[in-house]
Amino acid sequence: MKIITVTNQKGGTGKTSTTNALMAGLNKKGYKVLAVDLDPQCNLSFILKAQGNKPTALGILTGEANIKDAIQTSDIGDFIASSKQLSNADKLLDTVGREYKLKKALDAVKADYDFILIDTPPALSILTINALTACNSVIIPAVADIFSLQGVERLAETIEPIKEYTNSSIYIEGILLTKYTGDRTNLNKSVRDKAKMTAEKLNTKLFNTVIREAVAVKEAQAMLSNIFDYAPKAQVTSDYENFINELLEAE
């Protein structure tokens, strides 16, 4: 089984959209998937129609809840909902070994799944550190602009001490360009070339697949759905299908 953290320290790069599409696409291929929402914005939890009476990721991290009690079900797989109180996680998690809280909790259920996907906040915090400590690999969504790629480079600086101190086996699956409008402009082509160079510096790759800009992604979220069910014939759905196939082929 594989635990994948989807992260970028820059906001607006499509982390939640990518996690949701991965969850749906892998589920449709017959894989058993668990998603963990660690973002205090709770967007993934909202899309998955989380129940408010169940324990959340916060309870898992503080030890106040059993992970099996926190697992909810959706049409595209199981998930653990976020909590807005996770914004205080750096203060709430103040015990020795706080970096390992999520890893320890997932150890109790990981045998039940083929993939566990972790959606993270757009910031370096104890939440992101827990996600990186618990996972096998990392997918970095990035939009085609220079600031997003700077976020990728900052993330790489975070992963190095994680690899040294809390998770020696972690590796970066690759950088995924999202909200892409094509190579028609010199700027987009330049940013794509920069993304390739950034990937090489991180000893990883730029995925061959790019996720194009499409209103269907936001529409699917507004309908509390996923791109595969909402717009199965859309070009962006084909993009996500190709991305998932590329990811699985690298296994």
Predicted regions and their residues:
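P-loop NTP-binding core
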Residues: 1-251
